[in-house]
Amino acid sequence: MTIEISRIDPFDDDEVDAWWGCYAAAERADRGADAVVWSRAECRSELQQQSAVVDRRAYLLRDGADIVGSASLGLPLKDNTHVAHLAISVPPRHRRRGIGTEALAHLEREAVTSDRTTAQGSASWPYELGSEGAGSPGPEFARRHGYTLALGDVQSRLPLPVDPSLLDRIENDIASAISQYEIRSWVGRIPDDVVERWTILDATLETEAPTGELDIEPQKPDVDSIRESEELLDLQGRVSFGTIALSPDGDAAAYSQLVVSTDDGNAYQWGTLVRAADRGHRLGIAVKVANLRMLHREAPQARAVYTYLSLIHI
């Protein structure tokens, strides 16, 4: 068996369809009913975007005329430029033939050629298999090839709508704690008058949130990068819901963001963070409740919120 690995043209519908088909099949096999799969259109938009933030590359894996897998490589261009993000998708019927191993070697060579010194990837497994995912294909594949688990997350699902009386009780409970802060919410782009303050806080998320043993560095605040991510959301047909808490001096004290996929009808919890100096004022729950209120009002069709919580907190 000889595996041919070729980079796809993101504007070639047939190649994108084949790439996405392998990705979706692998995700559904590994996660079952809990699989959260980006739509074909969402993936296509991301691959086609001309990004100043990340160099995205996607590959097809072929055995003769048969497509047996797909892979992708993400190379950050502004922050953490020592890192390469790797992803490999081999549908179950093609596993245990060395296809993933060849794909991994190819991605690692590409990463080294691009002067990257750290490779990162992710794997999913059923919760009942424990914090190490023993026996699950993804974690076992990674361990066999010298990768170690740096950070574990648990996917959770909140059915919608949330009982309004529960939100009322929470708001009443936290009212005095947040009385000195201004809470602002919006749908779509971050308003121009707060985007710089949002960006300053958002840049600390990767290092303020649990990072385990991940080799990552603090990001530099960059409004252009935020605006690029918003442009991608528009291309994907996704809708962003944002809430910010402003301190008495006008700085960003906390924020939260939900993104709704118009493809699957679900909402996804993106960043939520409270600035260290403002912790203890119930701001985390305040911005989340405000976002849920807005989500109920503006997107009543949303079926659930998916979120990811570090194992460190469980």
Which functions belong to the PLM regions below?
Residues 30-57, 63, 71-79, 206-266, ...:
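A conserved beta-strand-loop-helix scaffold within acyl/acetyltransferase catalytic domains
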Residues 111-131, 295-308:
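Conserved GNAT acetyl-CoA-binding A-motif
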Residues 96-109, 274, 280-295:
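Conserved acetyl-CoA-binding loop-helix of GNAT-fold acetyltransferases
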Residues 148, 152-189:
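C-terminal "cap" of GNAT-fold acetyltransferases
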Residues 78, 122-124, 139-143, 148-161:
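Conserved catalytic-core motifs of GNAT/GCN5-like acyltransferases
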Residues 1-54, 62, 176-224:
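Short amphipathic alpha-helix that is part of the acyltransferase structural core
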Residues 87-95, 125, 271-280:
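A short, internal acetyl-CoA/4′-phosphopantetheine-binding micro-motif in the GNAT/acyltransferase core
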Residues 312-314:
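Conserved small/polar residues in nucleotide/adenosyl-binding loops
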